[in-house]
Structures are given as structure tokens and as C-alpha cells.
Amino acid sequence: MKNNLYSVYNDSNNVSFLYDNFCYTKKEIDTKIALLEQNFCKLLNNNIENKRVYLDIKDRFLFLISFFTMKKLNLATVLIPIEIQPQLFFEPGIIYISDNKHHDNGIFLTPDFNLVPEKDFNAENIKDFENIYDLYFFTSGSTGKSKNIGKWSSNILTELAELQKLFSIKKGDVFLCIPPIYHIYGFLFTMLPIFSSATIDLNSFFTPESIADYIVNSKIDYLVAVPSYYGLFDKLNLIECFSKLKGAFSSSGPLPGEISKKFFDKNIKIHEIYGSTETGGMAYRIYAKNPNYELIDYVNVKNYHPTEELELFISSPAISVEYDKEVGYCTGDIVKFIDERHFTLLGRNTRFVKIHGKRIDLGFISANFINYLKDTHAIILGENEIFVGCKDENIYLLAECKDKLNTIQISKDLRKILPGYAIPKRILQTKIPRNEMGKINKVAIEA
């Protein structure tokens, strides 16, 4: 019975890791974990209870061995995105382990699982923490202030069990997961094959072409990627390369419907998972079959109404933050219900600003701009190809569009659609900054 995050690995019978042209069996993985455990306990003088470990690990194989070692020792673990510099999160008393950065008070992890203390590391300075959660995801702050978001083992295990059942994952299935493991989406879909006694391919790829070529020449049953990658596969005419997959998954943002349909036409079903770090997975869909989302079985809606557009409130055992169980957790998403288990996702309710005392929803501007391009110029832009922001009470709009836009004419036309104070002062046709998951990086834009 799996009851903690180490048991995800330890209780799985036929799990294996594919890495660097080698297949590691459970017995071989156990040996690596035991070696790292021994080195870690020796370095810390066996004083590890109530400690907190920050893992900043780039190599996927090292990452998983390190993670399961820390969970075997029952240590609260913080997963750090490799693009984040230590000064953003480092605090005295933590245990910081990295294979790609050096910090004077940290520990460097080598490929052979040696732990090398940096020049100012002192095991006596490691302090105890009140670790409320078993696992923390450090968010980089692409949509706000950087922070740790905690999860209990039960949150993760609930979701893994449901995903395994929902998608009928079998022993022997092989997963290739492109998103980084330190992101909740990448983490869950790296844990899913391990939870299911299947195989996770830990090889890394840096171009869409290399991913497609690898899948053509390897046994891969499930691909896990983000919308931007699926868009590139389409743009580069690579969709045929994925025809032998049993299935594919997408998350971290909406997948454009036309992309879903193009893959579906080649008998490739892309399952979109809708959720967040705080809530876990909430719903799923295959857009090409049905553009509406279906709630995952463990999710209950607290404010169902058959006709109104409203903010979605839910209860779920995958939610890790405190919330009123009677009222439900406010997701911040605006939906319209089809029935009690299906809904259309309309947008977010989190982007209101005031312009000269008047309140305006930036999402309203974005939606009208997208509709205008579609209706007037037959140009299709997805939600992830436009960003509307506000600085010093001036609205600005960024658009990623291959068609040349006449921004002067567009500004004139928008005056017929939007109130004067909501007209963007600047419309720029440009590449929009994104993070590793393909999400729009609002901090980079507004810097």
C-alpha cells in the first residue's frame, strides 16, 4: 500500500529508468539510493531529523535518485527550478544540494553520487524546521512573487491513483516526459509511470526534431509535453512521427483546438490536464473530441449553476492549501457548466486593473482583440499568443503573429469595440517571453 512519496518507488515491482542508453532495474536503482543515503548521512553526522533539503538538480537521473533518497529519509524536500539563482531562496540552516551551481554553504552532487561540501558548509549550522508539508514546489515568480507551494504525500498519491485508473497505465508502458521534474506537471507525469510499475525515459532533448526522431526510433508509449511543443511539432510537419503513441498529455496552458484536431486526425489523442500546483489536477479533455472539460472523479463543484458564467469553487483531496470546506476553494477560473461534471473554461478572473478610476478586465481586452483579428482579418491567435498588460495606467498589448499586423489601423478599429480608456496605447507584434514550461513570463515582460 503506497502511503508516502518514497513508496511510489519502493512499492513498484517492475519499475525501471531509461537513461543514457542504459536501462536501470529496480535493484540497480536501489543500489544508487543506498549509496547516496550513506554519503548524505555521513556528511550530516546522521543529524537529519526535521531538516529541510533544497534540491537544485539538472540531471534527471540524479534528480530522481536524490529525491527518493530524501523521501526514504523522510525529509521535507523543496524542488528548485534550475534557472533560479540561490540568492533568491537561500536561507541559513537549509541543506542545499546542486549538480549545476556552487554555493559557499551548499553541497555539490557529482555524477557518481558523491556529495562534496562547499568551502563554508558546516553540518553544525543546519537547523530544524517545522515542516508542515512533505514536498514543496518553488515557483519562479513568472506570475508574481516567488514562493514555496507545499503538498502532502496524500495530495500526490490521490492524483496518481486517479490518473493511473483514468488512462489505464500498464506495466511495461514507457513514458517520455519533456517538462522539468521540478514543475508540478513534470513531477506528476514522471511519478505516474513509477507509481504504475512502468518505465520512465529520463533522456533529455533540446529540439522538437530530436524528440520526434527519438520517438520514431524508440519504444515510447506516452509523450508528456506542453502546448508550445505540440505547436512546434505541427509547424515543423512532425506530427506523423508520433503516430505509434498510445497517447499524449499536455498541460501548463490551453492547447489550441486546431493543434489538438491535427494530431487527432492522425489517431493521436492529446489529453489536456487542467489544474494548478495548489489544486492538483481538476479536469481533463481531448479538445478534438469535445472542447469541454470533464471533472476528475475526486473533484466536487461547490457552486454548480446550469446557466450562469461563474467563478469555479471546488473541493478536492488534491488541494493542499487551507480553504473553507463548505464554500470551496476559489480557482479564479470563469466557467460555464454544461452539466454537473462538464464545463467550458472561459478565462481567468484575476486580471482587473484601474484606469483613471475605471475598473477594466485585461482578459476582456484580450478576448475582444482575438475575436477582432478572427472576424476582421481571418487571423487566428490563441490565448497564449497574446499578452495584455498595464503600466502607469496605460494598457499595452503584445501579439505573436506570423501575419503582418497594421497596428495603426487596429487601434482605430478597436475604438469601435472597446471603451476609450481600454484601448491599448501600444500594440507590439513581437515574441513574448516565456518560461521553461512555455507559460508567458509576466515578470520578464513587466521588468
Which residues fall in each region the model found?
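Conserved AMP-binding/adenylate-forming core of the ANL superfamily
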Residues: 11-46, 151-154
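AMP-binding/adenylate-forming catalytic domain of the ANL superfamily
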Residues: 418-440
